[in-house]
Amino acid sequence: MGGGLLQLVAYGAQDAYITGNPHITFWKVLYKRHTNFAMEAFRVNFTGSPQYGQRVVAIINRNADLMYKTYLEVQLPDTQTVDVKWTSAWERRLGYQLLKKIEVEIGGQIIDTHYGEWLFLWENLTSNFDNSVKLDTMLGGYLGGTETTAVSCGGRPAILYIPLQFWFCRNPGLALPLIALQYHEVRINVTLSPATDLVTAATPGSTTVSAAAALLPQIKDMALYIDYIYLDVDERRRFAQQSHEYLIDQLQFGLQQTLTTANARIDLTLNHPVKELVWVFQDARKTDCGSTLTLNAGFTQPFSYDDIVNRARLQINGQDRFDERYGDYFWKVQPYQHHTGGAFFPMRSQVTAPAALTVLAGSCSVTGDVLTVGADPASGTAPQQLIVEGATVSTTSPGTFAPGTIIQSFGTGSGKQGTYQLSEPSLLTGTTTGLSVIFTLPNLNYTPHENPINVYSFALQPEEHQPSGTCNFSRIDTTTLVFDSIFTAGIAKPTKSTPFNFRMYAVNYNIFRVMSGMGGLAYSN
């Protein structure tokens, strides 16, 4: 008898708890059939043109039956003005920094409000490292150059894709039933950050932030792209005729306060059953473009936070909710215990190539419509762009190419040497003087970077829709966060001369009801 058969017949009373009266088998695939549906993305425009610091509104069209995943698509200016640079937004998360706040309004009632900073915090807590790297490219994580150089879009506009995180965007079972909201209009209200929050002077001190912001070109285009869901006839009829009740997540912006003392008691104003609290401390100089803070290096860091807490505790109605804990417990242990992401944000750093720029007159040449790339061991990879570098290049057509003009982008290739076809050879006179080839740089490094985002969760799994624990702050009179600061190398304590900002967010449950063609919240603040 084989060993496998011995295992099979070694069956006792204890096995009855594991394999007795089985419900599943691993050796036959089972699946469930789903209702018929189709999904299509539609563009929804905002009323008026988007301007920095202004509020714009998008009225959601009833293109289909349900409203699901929603993205804000922003087309940035394709030109830059001298001495005007985009803010770094902590590894250039420009898409989040652009949003001051964004609201869902149904029937004239604000159902939920999110903030650019909250989207950043939520990404850190819920996205794994690989997804954060992908989001980096969607949110303007690398528009060209470094934080202190101008955005270079290669002659075309840079486009930001900002995923929204409202309740109906994250769970298909919570998709917004437009078919059942016949008498209530659905709107998405977006308030953009002022230009002074988005730029800094290229050379600190040479141009004031206000002057730099005044020179910043306006956003070229902005729109929502929404995944609409078409339901089949029977399910569509049920959605239209029946009442609906959804358990949804809401965000509360609990408090924003400036700290000027090392020890503090912060009173929080919260409502509803809350499943987790999220808060941050930040040196106020990090959002002040005019600051002389050394680590600013001439640009702002709105999403860079500080670890200043020695010990902290939460008090509810004057009673300690838990024993006093060290400050790093809230941004190390709590995210590890309750979140799939973490406060270790992927920091992008560019590897410097030994010879990223190779002059054509040296190892490359243009003959007719062919670019020939010669041997250059230092460059290491295929050419990325043919550009004008350092001199004006004449063309066969009227006009000239100024320095910085991109003649052609090649993308990625299989090797550094060889010939490359030029798409517009007639534009060149045959001269090689002043032309350069930009070689693809080595892969950009992504390394974890500690970014202290503090969490306290009342739920076992706060990322899940299924409730797993809450604290009903509507039934609590006072809530206070008590802490004392500790000096950390390179980080000052809160004082009047070096104030710190404190911001608290809370995620709570509420009930969203849809009946008789109208929708609204069951519980208000």
Report residues per predicted region.
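Short, low-complexity Pro/Thr/Gly
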Residues: 1-356, 440-525
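Small/polar beta-strand repeat architecture
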Residues: 353-389, 394-442
